[in-house]
A protein has these predicted regions:
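Bacterial N-terminal signal peptides that target proteins for export
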Residues: 1-8
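Bacterial N-terminal signal peptides
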Residues: 8-16
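Extended beta-strand solenoid/passenger and fiber regions
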Residues: 21-84, 88-96, 102, 109-134
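Serine-esterase "nucleophile elbow" of acetyl-processing enzymes
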Residues: 130-204, 216-230
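Solvent-exposed loop/turn segments at secondary-structure junctions
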Residues: 167-171, 205-211, 236-241, 274-278, ...
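Catalytic-core regions of hydrolytic enzymes
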Residues: 205-229, 239-254
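A short helix->loop->beta-strand "cap" motif at the edges of active sites that frequently abuts
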Residues: 263-267
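Catalytic His-Asp segment of secreted/periplasmic serine-dependent ester chemistry enzymes
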Residues: 273-349
Length: 349
């Protein structure tokens, strides 16, 4: 990826969380590109309450100013409760009514029985300032695992990141390549270590699990030439009904870390997944166990861990799941990919 583009993307990442005393509770913080779906005249929660009056804008595209983007009008298309941090459609709003989505209100749904289950046509995107902001992810020290990675980045020169996982890592529901979490993280690292020339190669296996990650190793990540760092994230498909139990999943991840180190000579970061739609029929709805298994695998394999699950759970304390899911099942939208990247930034090394 071009260095200038990486730096530009890093600025996009940074714009979404600019704080006085980054992430501290109760601090003023700007949020950009937060996604919502709004039904009828029911209020939808933002990530934070105590929104600064007059700071909120709402549009139809993730990127402000994109051709064809509609900027909605407060008081005409929506109303804001600034203290509570909610947005509500008006009765005659131009904002798409999410109650017309085929999965709205469905319980235990089988997505194969519905003609279209995407949320993209219903998303709106908010920019605002809150005076009650906090960190998206808890910082944690991973320097004992990533010290050599830091040395390589500081030294400069080519630095290759390989990403290996399921359809989320393959970019599921991100609208542009640069908005996928691994490219956002590469942009963050590029800005932090300007001497490095960072590239990303994704070799993910959409629709499959950690077992296929092992079985098809040579066909996928085995083809990457001299990666320095591998971002490895399975779990969304493992977690489905009929998948392996968390212990087997953990062992698979430990095996993958060992294979990557021995065969490719790369350091590894394992990252957890988030809970899919609670109303989806095919989920086992025990993602907390798979997230914990990922953390345990990282500890056992002595590699770094990015805690995506906890970041997602923090956001879900206020927001509904559909407002974060591009396919309304298990793929994050652009804002969700940004949340993933925040979990990576929280690793300090």
């Amino acid at each position: 990826m071009d260095t200038k583009l990486l730096i530009a993307l890093s600025l996009i990442c940074a714009m979404a969380c600019v704080a006085q005393g980054y992430g501290a509770p109760g601090k003023t913080m700007s949020v950009q590109g937060e996604s919502l779906v709004l039904a009828k005249t029911e209020p939808g929660n933002l990530c934070f309450d105590q929104v600064t009056k007059g700071s909120l804008t709402l549009r139809s595209t993730y990127v402000a100013g994109k051709k064809g983007s509609v900027v909605y009008t407060e008081g005409v298309d929506y109303v804001v409760d600034y203290a509570k941090g909610t947005i509500t459609r008006t009765a005659n709003s131009r904002i798409p009514d999410y109650s017309t989505n085929c999965l709205y209100g469905q319980k235990d749904f089988d997505h194969t029985k519905f003609p279209s289950f995407s949320n993209h046509a219903w998303f709106v995107w908010a920019d605002y300032q809150t005076t009650n902001g906090r960190s998206w992810a808890k910082p944690h020290d991973q320097s004992k695992y990533l010290a050599d990675i830091r040395k390589k980045l500081e030294a400069g020169g080519p630095f290759k990141i390989a990403s290996y996982g399921d359809s989320i890592t393959a970019g599921g529901e991100a609208s542009e390549t640069g908005f996928r979490f691994q490219y956002r993280y590469a942009a963050y690292l590029q800005a932090k270590f300007p001497k490095a020339k960072i590239s990303v190669q994704d070799v993910s296996i959409s629709g499959y699990s950690s077992q296929q990650g092992i079985d098809w190793f040579d066909k996928y990540i085995g083809t990457v030439d001299k990666p320095d760092l591998a971002l490895v994230g399975f779990g969304m498909n493992d977690h489905n009904i009929g998948g392996p139990d968390p212990e087997k999943f953990k062992n698979n991840l430990v095996t993958l870390v060992k294979m990557i180190r021995e065969r490719k000579g790369a350091e590894v970061i394992l990252f957890s997944a988030f809970p899919p739609n609670d109303n989806w029929h095919y989920g086992s709805h025990r993602m907390a166990q798979f997230a914990e298994a990922t953390r345990e695998a990282a500890a056992e394999a002595h590699c770094a861990y990015a805690d995506v699950y906890s970041t997602w759970e923090m956001v879900l304390q206020r927001k509904d799941q559909s407002s974060l899911l591009g396919n309304n099942i298990n793929h994050p939208d652009d804002f969700g990919h940004w949340m993933y990247e925040q979990a990576f930034e929280a690793m300090k090394f």
